[in-house]
Amino acid sequence: MSRPKFTRVLLKLSGESLAGSQGYGIDPKTITTIAREIKEVVQQGVQLALVIGGGNIFRGLAASSQGMDRAGADNMGMLATMINSLAMQDALEKIGVATRVQSAIVMQQVAEPYIRRRAIRHLEKGRVVIFGAGTGNPYFTTDTAASLRAMEISAQAILKGTKVDGVYTADPKKDATATKLPRLAYIDVLKRGLQVMDATATSLCMDNNLPIIVFDLTTEGNIIKVINGEEIGTIVQGE
């Protein structure tokens, strides 16, 4: 078995990644598959934190464009991330992975409050920590929450699981001439408007030199491959 390249990482998943082929909600088979891959990572001694989006349940930005108050819509989106976080906790604990959910919004009956030192202690004890409710503030995406939490826990990289095997010059589903970019500088992502993470999240990573690795989550075994240093996606880092 390969020696892990990283000892502490943050895995960022979109809400849609939990929906599977149904496109909405949470697909039990899909979430179980992801949980098994996470278990394999933990068994290698890697400390892993998670941030999950909420787009499979509710999108605050989309709702605000339809006339809903943006702050209220974003609050609903944060609650959607908590639903996904609790679902992932259940999937992980059913296969024997100790997990803690920490929420940026106080909801003490279902999750711990976000406390940085406590989160780090959980990681040191081999528990998976799931950060829910984004940053706890409207107008900030879960990508930004992932960047913030990754820096707070001193993660060595953000692993962003997507539906494509990296970053392309254009949408490969719409443009047959699109080519994959195996390596990118943060500034190029910002200048070219590439769909890696939103500008705020990318800028945070750039300012703190935190690598972002974009990879295909839909192919089984890819999480462990990235952890072990296989270059299967796109790595975004300093020039």
From Swiss-Prot:
Pathway assignment: Pyrimidine metabolism; CTP biosynthesis via de novo pathway; UDP from UMP (UMPK route): step 1/1
Involved in allosteric activation by GTP: annotated segments: 20-25
Keywords: Allosteric enzyme, ATP-binding, Cytoplasm, Kinase, Nucleotide-binding, Pyrimidine biosynthesis, Transferase
Highest taxon listed in the record's lineage: Bacteria
Alphabetical list of InterPro entries matching this protein: AceGlu_kinase-like_sf, Asp/Glu/Uridylate_kinase, Uridylate_kinase, Uridylate_kinase_bac
EC number: 2.7.4.22
Acetylation in keyword set: no
List of residues binding ATP: 12-15, 55, 59, 162, 168, 171
Reactions performed catalytically: UMP + ATP = UDP + ADP
Summary of activators and inhibitors of this protein: Allosterically activated by GTP. Inhibited by UTP.
Function: Catalyzes the reversible phosphorylation of UMP to UDP.
Similarity section: Belongs to the UMP kinase family.
Quaternary organization: Homohexamer.
Name this protein carries in UniProt: Uridylate kinase
Organism: Pelobacter propionicus (strain DSM 2379 / NBRC 103807 / OttBd1)
Gene, per the UniProt record: pyrH
